[in-house]
Amino acid sequence: MIEVPPFWCPLPIAIHPAADQAEKDARAWAERYGVRLRIADQVQPGRLGAYWAPHGTYEGMLAVGCWNFWAFAFDDHLDEPLPLDVPVTTSLVQQAVDIPSPPITDDPWAAGAQAVFNMFRDLATPTQVRYCADNHRRWLHGACWRHSNHVNRRLPPLAEYIPLRMQDAAAQATCLIAVLIGSDISVPEQEMDSPRVRALLETASWTATIDSDLHSFQLEDTQRPVSQHIVSVLMHERGIGVDEALRQSVALRDRFMTRFLHLQQECARTGSSELARFAHTLGYVISGYLQWAVDTSRYGQTEATFSFTDTPRDDTPEPPPGIPSVEWLWTL
């Protein structure tokens, strides 16, 4: 049995009191739009939305759960088996995200994407929706990169993997949808577009991305000839075994978490009240994902075990070596 090193997460965990109802309503929404998630009973995407937006309105939290249903199902569609039309499919979906009407009826993926973003439009400001749509586009761009790597049986170098895997994991889209839509937080644009807030979002996104990689790497290894995740990338690039790659993955993840915690405190201390709420609520995306992963069996086919620790493996307040694209996160 492969043991994943313990996860360090000094962030609060909470869940919306209407989590069970949201799961039922999100599932009904998915069925209405023909969104089929094979393991919905185990995954419970609506409940995940309740972890991400524990203090949001019911409508906002439900909208996040509906997007989770659609996104999990769509991600599975892109992966198993690898379809050859990924660039076409992702382009049509993003077009549907950007166009609120007329209703799309000839493609269930596009129809579902349009419908859920129309839910966002009913709940949020145009600026909030734009941030979500722009980062949704980044996700689908990253999915095309991953698809090309799988088709060509290619493992990318670490310096390439770090920025592009964050897109492919939908990490920034997830964070923004969970916080802006689920909790109805509207940070002034001047603050939202600042380098410091961008760094806050990226460090949260990368922490969550590595958590996702660590939870799923064994399952993916059984399903693809060349599996692409942080563990396999480190093994390939550094010529190390799986145990050492896991240790290095967790150390890298904890360094991102350390930087996120510093930026979270700084934004809460020096920013607007909405930025303070944004920074605090981002923490629920990280902690909520971990608790949801423990609760569900999405990755139950693996033989990995998961535990938690109060001590980071690496809390060095400096950028990790060999990844130029993230050095700026430590210069602010």
Swiss-Prot record:
GO molecular function terms noted in the UniProt entry: magnesium ion binding; terpene synthase activity
Enzymatic reactions: (2E,6E,10E)-geranylgeranyl diphosphate = tsukubadiene + diphosphate
Cofactor binding summary note: Binds 3 Mg(2+) ions per subunit.
Motif interval(s): DDXXXE motif: 75-80
Keywords: Lyase, Magnesium, Metal-binding
Cofactors demanded by this protein: Mg(2+)
Residues reported to bind Mg(2+) 3: S212, S216, E220
Residue sites binding Mg(2+) 2 per the record: E80
EC nos: 4.2.3.159
Residues that coordinate or bind substrate: R165, R298, Y299
Transmembrane segments: none
Binding site for Mg(2+) 1: D75, E80
Extent of motif SXXXSXXXE motif: 212-220
UniProt entry tagged with the keyword Transferase: no
Pfam families: Terpene_syn_C_2
Cited function: Catalyzes the formation of the 5-9-5 ring skeleton (3S,6S,11R,14S)-tsukubadiene from geranylgeranyl diphosphate (GGPP) via a 1,11-cyclization and a 10Re,14Re-cyclization.
Domain-related comment: The Asp-Asp-Xaa-Xaa-Xaa-Glu (DDXXXE) and Ser-Xaa-Xaa-Xaa-Ser-Xaa-Xaa-Xaa-Glu (SSE) motifs are important for the catalytic activity, presumably through binding to Mg(2+).
Family under the similarity heading: Belongs to the terpene synthase family.
Protein's name according to its UniProt entry: Tsukubadiene synthase
